């Protein structure tokens, strides 16, 4: 049976989304101590500087992701950046390209806003996530944004092409 997925902006307080985020929180809590979980709550996800997206597979919520625009800081030499947050694809929906498509959607949103740097923090033991980010061109970097370098987190960066040609190719 052919299945299709659609990615679109979504309200983070939608009941299906809050249930998925609660599932993600439980998963992260099973892997890391509370001080190593850097979770944006629903209030923060609804902020104007956050773009939140949901992926639906045959109408069912399959995943979500957000990007938060940040002003520059010392860790980025004053450059504005977008931080990938709350990225998740349900385990039974993986292997269909949903995660990669969500990531491309976030990158496209940053390009629309003329932001050429995407950063993220993920857990070192989340091997599927690390593989996804590295396959998408993200490279290891030092901690940023006040995150502690605690040995549990991995930090990644990707330069985004802001030229008209780069935007069309994305």
What are these regions (language model features)?
Residues 2-85, 90-91, 103-105, 109, ...:
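Acetyl-CoA-dependent GNAT
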Residues 96, 100, 104:
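Residues forming the Rossmann-fold NAD(P)(H) cofactor-binding site
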Residues 12, 119-122, 130, 134-155:
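Conserved catalytic-core motifs of GNAT/GCN5-like acyltransferases
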Residues 97, 114, 137:
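Short glycine-rich hinge loops at helix-strand junctions in the catalytic core
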Residues 90-92, 96, 124:
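Active-site acidic-Proline motif in GNAT/NAT acetyltransferases
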Residues 102, 126-129:
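Conserved short alpha-helix immediately C-terminal to the canonical SAM/SAH-binding motif I
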Residues 103, 110-122:
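Conserved GNAT acetyl-CoA-binding A-motif
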